[in-house]
UniProtKB/Swiss-Prot annotation:
UniProt organism field: Papiliotrema laurentii (Cryptococcus laurentii)
GO biological process: one example: methionine biosynthetic process
Signal sequence coordinates: none
Cofactor: pyridoxal 5'-phosphate
Protein name: Cystathionine beta lyase
Length: 17
């Protein structure tokens, strides 16, 4: 998870952290 929230479509992070 990104601490700042990632774009899950691109980064694979959940976008909610």
């Amino acid at each position: 998870h990104d601490v700042y929230g990632g774009d899950y479509r691109i980064t694979g992070d959940d976008g909610h952290s």
